[in-house]
Swiss-Prot record:
Residues under site feature: Plays a key role in the stabilization of the transition state and positioning the aldehyde component: Y113, F131, Y209
SUPFAM superfamilies: AraD/HMP-PK domain-like
Cofactor entry: Zn(2+)
Source lineage: Bacteria, Pseudomonadati, Pseudomonadota, Gammaproteobacteria, Pasteurellales
Entry protein name: L-fuculose phosphate aldolase
Binding, Zn(2+): E73, H92, H94, H155
Top EC category: lyase
Cofactor comment: Binds 1 zinc ion per subunit.
Gene name per UniProt: fucA
Source organism: Haemophilus influenzae (strain ATCC 51907 / DSM 11121 / KW20 / Rd)
Main function: Involved in the degradation of L-fucose and D-arabinose. Catalyzes the reversible cleavage of L-fuculose 1-phosphate (Fuc1P) to yield dihydroxyacetone phosphate (DHAP) and L-lactaldehyde.
């Protein structure tokens, strides 16, 4: 895809994220790897008003185009691309259940085999840091090295993938897992978990099965 096509795909993903109930207002942000940096949503602009020319290019050193302001979270997007060379897209949102768990500062353990969509046997929750800060970007780099999906304490969710379709799909799956986990926690009962051995079997199967989404 060329820049205009990638920019439109970013906008389409933002609109779909809202349609799916994963985000609201101007919260959240989306990016794709481009050249030596990334294309990312602008700061503070409602998704339905975005045009392709509003999407901002930020190079690998964090320098952005003149007369454009990238999302305030551009630092952690860049940290994902630096940490995971295979990642070509990043989706960040404040979905209800993921944000709820993040407020509790709880990772999602192996409550269900689909936790393995993260690429590991749990979904981490990284420590709180102010949005847009270098410290938050550092926490994200540590967490995303371990898992393709991470919760940000008192904040929300980040997912990454080979393309935007996969990153958005992963965000949907993690939101469902978060909703299950919150409901389980509300029972006050001890929650049985899958063992590391059981999750390793699932992870092995996912390597050969995988998610086959071709970006449109």
């Amino acid at each position: 895809m060329n820049r205009a096509e990638l920019s439109q795909k970013i906008i389409d993903t933002c609109l779909e994220m809202t349609k799916l109930g994963l985000n609201q207002g101007t919260a959240g942000n989306v990016s794709v790897r481009y050249k030596d940096g990334m294309l990312i949503t602008p700061t503070g602009m409602p998704y339905h008003l975005m045009k392709t020319e509003n999407i901002v290019y930020v190079d690998g050193n964090g320098k952005h185009e003149e007369n454009k302001l990238p999302s305030s979270e551009w630092q952690f997007h860049l940290s994902v691309y630096h940490t995971r060379p295979e990642a070509n897209a990043v989706v960040h949102n404040h979905s209800i259940h993921c944000a709820g768990l993040s407020i509790l500062e709880k990772p999602i353990p192996a409550i269900h085999y689909m936790v393995a969509v993260s690429g590991t046997d749990h979904i981490p929750c990284v420590p709180y840091a102010t949005f847009g800060s270098h410290k938050l970007a550092s926490y994200v780099a540590t967490g995303i090295k371990e898992s393709k999906a991470i919760l940000l304490a008192h904040h929300g969710l980040i997912t990454c993938g080979e393309n935007l379709d996969k990153a958005l799909w992963l965000a949907q799956e993690v939101e469902v897992l978060a909703s299950w986990y919150l409901k389980l926690l509300s029972t006050g009962l001890e929650i049985p978990l899958l063992s590391k051995e059981q999750m390793q079997v699932v992870l092995g199967k996912f390597h050969t099965y995988g998610l086959r989404i071709e970006e449109s």
